[in-house]
Amino acid sequence: AEKTLKSMIQQTSFAVSTNEARPVHMGSLFEVSAAGLTVVSVDGFRLALRKEPLEKIEGGAFSFVAPGTALNEVERICEEIDEVVTITLGQRHILFEVGETELICRRLEGEFLDYKNAIPRRNPINIVLDTKTMLQSLERVSVVISEKLKSPVRCIFEDDKVTMSAKTASGDAKDICRIAGDGQGLEIGFN
């Protein structure tokens, strides 16, 4: 439904590239199959991926790349209209229908990153966390970060916990979030 598509766009569009050297990455890859809908965005530094089951698929599996600018409009339309979203693929264009509203955009052509090979298949680190709790913890740590004082949030994943911290000229912040599993000391910085 529209709320699902809207959140999929929101959660992947931040990684859409603005670099015109690779125009195909200035959009998001949509893969439709019996398994559901997968939306992928990449910008050379980040990869954002979201999967959801689909209510109904007509025809076989297909994929396309939609421009990021068009997806921003689709997201806005989904916010205003509470209807089912229909996606129709043409040879060079994509039609998004939300209620009485239609948006037609051109497909981006080119070879999109093979994201399935970019993500390691086997990973010795396996953790489970509550995303709501993690986001709340992240918000608490981010209070010392501003547009002027950009600094990464460092996350250290250990046995049953992740420690998040940020340091800027205006102060330091630290918070601990409970997880299931052992992060084996994995440290990640998020901008």
Question: Which positions does each model-derived feature cover?
Answer:
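Specificity-determining recognition surfaces
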Residues: D114-Y115
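DNA polymerase processivity clamps
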Residues: A1-K51, E55-L108, N123-N191
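Glycine-rich, pocket-lining loop/helix-strand segments that form or immediately flank
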Residues: E111
